[in-house]
Amino acid sequence: VCLKALSKNIKDLNNFILIGDIEHFRSLNNGLKLDLNFDLEKKTKNTVKVFQIPLSERVKLGMPSLKNAKYTLDVLLEASLGTLEKRYSAMITGPINKSIINEYGFEFSGHTEFLADISNTKNVVMLLANKALKVALATTHLPLKDVAAKITSQRLEKYLKILNNELKSKWKIKNPKICVLGLNPHAGENGFLGTEETLSLIHI
């Protein structure tokens, strides 16, 4: 996905740095029949600069390897620290296999929690956004059976305040209008299909 996106924006290649194994990128590039060039040192007109982090084992697409769990973490760590240290202006992440990271021995539930921890950020809200719609999540990376217990009045109030402030400051929305979705079918039907709305959502 990353290489295909870059191939469609050739004029912007110099704005990006890929973090990972350069030979892996070259292999993908050849397999996809794209026309990208990669370099470890310089950025030229049609070249993508790569910050080299070597794979432990050659990648087999669709078959995540425990041997490459550390590689995945190292890539994420370099991108995160580089952004915090302002060596990079921003970071773009793709999906990663959480199971092999946890099997490797590193407790990992998702990018959101990882970034909050590494940046020492206590309160964090995940926001999915495009030009038409912005969706904030009240919980992240939890088994479904644990979700309802996490949605409390205190948690919602905290998240809504963060969201309201961010919409004003970063998105320049003067008076944000925030809709809170119900947890149960038909928002609980006044308690007949669940009580989370009457106990938490409506109160907030």
Language-model features: locations:
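Contiguous, glycine/small-aliphatic-enriched amphipathic segments in soluble metabolic enzymes
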Residues: 1-111, 154-201
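A glycine-rich helix N-cap at a beta->alpha junction
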Residues: 112-117
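Phosphate-binding loop that captures ATP/GTP phosphates
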Residues: 119-122
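Short beta-strand
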Residues: 127-128, 172
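Ligand-binding beta-strand-loop-alpha-helix segment within the catalytic cores
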Residues: 128-159
